[in-house]
């Protein structure tokens, strides 16, 4: 059905591009393949969070690791904690957090005059950028979620070295190890380090990054050091034994030499994703304005293990996700494998 009598404003063409069979599936696959947070294992799919039967939030059950215990056994009728000659059964405690779902969409429109004027196809260009656009939107949502969780609930999982001097205010192996120690023995579970480019390139300038090609099998990996000489665009950086993600959307507060950068240390699968409505694509043609329009929508939610969405409402904006009053914990904070690390960079 044609669009109603109106002009799609704000647009820049080629609705046939999205009628190609399986285009939407290809686009969603590309989104996941281009997501460093997905490829590194930080984000994992959890079908229990999908709420495919309907709903605005999901309950996320989980078990709290039991405290180790044992009893001395003897050859009499009074041994054990029971005092009656038998072992006392213990229980494992379950906890249930809540995850909220979000519904997002975006749309582009272009007219034939813009195509004629530019000599190119603006809609084709738009479609080429879509996976990058959706990925940036997802990253912005994830970082807002992290800001909210670390505001109060996980504040104790933060290490701030930005007040240091003489180089101590920059990211170092010592700072990263200190951040890992916040979780005690569970600090060894942290395997991915996400940082801003200004932090990343400082490490690279110091020769502190080690690179490995992502195309090699783990048992046959080839490593280079000294700034990544000879490394192709498939390079994967490691620092202090952790895989590095570089993203310019990582939080920065302040400017210039006073800028403070927030990095995150993640354990595998600590961010779980539910998908209530997979990416849906639709297109239309307005014959009165000679415009093509394409729209996208998706419904999903991120959940950080051990946390809980405590707000009354659902389908939050990124601003609401960043609100520290909307989150609580259902696990002890040391059981949640995420640590926040704040530092400065000489490349600000």
List each language-model region with its residue ranges.
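Sequence/fold signature of self-assembling virion shell proteins
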Residues: 2-40, 166-171, 205-348
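Extended, solvent-exposed, turn-rich assembly/linker loops in the middle of proteins
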Residues: 151-229
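A generic "binding-loop/recognition-motif" signal
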Residues: 24, 104, 199
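Alpha-helical scaffold segments that mediate packing/assembly in large oligomeric complexes
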Residues: 110-185, 325-348
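Short, solvent-exposed loop/turn elements at domain surfaces
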Residues: 67-72, 202, 254, 304
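Long, contiguous amphipathic alpha-helices that act as assembly "spine/axial" helices in icosahedral shell
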Residues: 60-61, 91-154, 186-194, 279, ...
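Assembly/oligomerization interface modules of large self-assembling protein complexes
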Residues: 33-104
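Short, well-ordered loop/turn elements at secondary-structure boundaries
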Residues: 55, 187-189, 238-240
